[in-house]
């Protein structure tokens, strides 16, 4: 079977606090490491989706409704469901990596980086499906 968990692939989180949220793989580790002896992936995802926007709304209201809250986390492959979609969101690998979990300040910085990049991509109007809440 081919390796399909690749960076840029959209996944659904199945377990934990962010279950039901969409995320994108930043880095995948198929063979595991010494501290995590199972296949896992570093993902960046959307915790709070942007709200619906209509043409009748003003600029300030649209700006307020277009905010996104993100998360950065390492997940076991068992807790991720891959989709057929992939998005091209160029997250800065120096800011968003596995070392951020050692220091809360670095984690905040990584979350901020993901938030900024997600909002940029959202404003272009591409990948609409990724920025909509999964109805279940």
Curated annotation (Swiss-Prot):
It is found in: Cytoplasm, Cytosol; Cytoplasm; Rough endoplasmic reticulum. The keyword Cytoplasm applies. Residues 5-40 form the KOW domain. Keywords: Acetylation, Cytoplasm, Endoplasmic reticulum, Ribonucleoprotein, Ribosomal protein. GO terms for biological process: rRNA processing; translation. GO terms for molecular function: structural constituent of ribosome. Gene3D superfamilies: 2.30.30.770. GO terms for cellular component: cytoplasmic side of rough endoplasmic reticulum membrane; cytosolic large ribosomal subunit; large ribosomal subunit. It holds the Pfam family Ribosomal_L27e. Component of the large ribosomal subunit. Required for proper rRNA processing and maturation of 28S and 5.8S rRNAs. Belongs to the eukaryotic ribosomal protein eL27 family. Component of the large ribosomal subunit. Interacts with RRP1B. Component of the large ribosomal subunit. Interacts with RRP1B. Interacts with DHX33. This is Large ribosomal subunit protein eL27. It comes from Canis lupus familiaris (Dog).
């Amino acid at each position: 079977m081919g390796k399909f968990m690749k960076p840029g692939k959209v996944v659904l989180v199945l377990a934990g606090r962010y279950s039901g949220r969409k995320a994108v793989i930043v880095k995948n580790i198929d063979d595991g490491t010494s501290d995590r002896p199972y296949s896992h992936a570093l993902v960046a995802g959307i915790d709070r989706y942007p709200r619906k926007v209509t043409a009748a709304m003003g600029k300030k209201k649209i700006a307020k409704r277009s905010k996104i809250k993100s998360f950065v986390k390492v997940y076991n492959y068992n807790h991720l469901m891959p989709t057929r979609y992939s998005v091209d969101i160029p997250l800065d690998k120096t800011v968003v990596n596995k070392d951020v979990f050692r220091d809360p300040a670095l984690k905040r910085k990584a979350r901020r980086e993901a938030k900024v990049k997600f909002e940029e991509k959202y404003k272009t109007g591409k990948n609409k499906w990724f920025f909509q809440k999964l109805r279940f």
